Amino acid sequence: SDHFYDLCDEMGLIVWQDLMFACNVYDLTEEFEENITKEITENVKRLRHHASLGLWCGNNEMESAWDHWPEVQSESKYLRADYIKMFEHVVPKAVKAADSETFFWQSSPSSGGCFDEPDDENRGDCHYWDVWHGQKPFTDYQKHYFRFCSEFGFQSFPCLKTVESFTEEKDRNIFSRVMEKHQKNPAANGKILYYLSENFRYPENFRKLLYVSQILQGMAMKYGVDHWRRHRGRCMGTLYWQINDNWPVASWASIDY
């Protein structure tokens, strides 16, 4: 909402503003090109005056997806050409026409576009998920010196009060059907237990398990943030995934629903 940007202006917060394209491929028809040009123009004009606006980012994980995601790699080469046309030409042209001052970045992560090693740690921004998805230990953060880490994170369970809002007593087991439905990352409840077993003794009850998972999340995030802050100059910033939730769920959020 516009109120969000007003608050960021007042509080001195800088907004990394993604355009609404993420984790997908698009067939760039004439009609779609016309539609996105109008959408971008309208929204850039709506937000361009905000002091909090740090940059426009063309998309999330669409450039790097061609290197890492089998479902994207199997797509037609013509869709790859459409990606280049869309995010190297159509989208930046529309943004610059409406806002010539704010920096535009084609994709995240990226080394500058056109599929030029988007995960290069020496250029651009990187997303780092070996801690969590790769189940690497927290110490693995210390092996990486990104120029800017624009996404990393770690999951925890919500508070007991939140869990009670969507479960009955018989469901209060992290592998129950209800608890699994309130977890959208496959096998993630097991990942939390794996990391918990590496760092703590197993909690004696369900309430303590939820709480300890949050302590674990805090430890993971602190480890990464502390490492990259120590190397300021080489790494000039981080963004973590994520701050909050829009429904009661186990997730990467720091703030419970």
Language model features: what each stretch is:
Residues 1-103, 108-110, 114-115, 238:
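Active-site mouth of glycoside hydrolases
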Residues 56, 93-96, 106-257:
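Substrate-binding clefts and catalytic carboxylate motifs of secreted carbohydrate-active enzymes
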